[in-house]
């Protein structure tokens, strides 16, 4: 594994852990103050954390975060992400995890 792969992996697991912490705390708090650029960056971070949880297969925490985002479907689609594809991927991961538990 190259050093860049290790860094990507570490970043990925950090996002997963961060997502679990946010979910356990009731969700990711919205950024109410700051510049529009800071708010836009916060939205990207939210999407990144949510997608990392989905990819990891941690649907329980991902659903808490998705529920926490008002109008999650509109929110996700407004960021050029395909909501139906995300749900389909989450279901595939869930089925795979049930069929072959680690």
Regions found by a protein language model. Give the residues of each.
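Charged, low-complexity intrinsically disordered segments and flexible loops
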Residues: 2-102
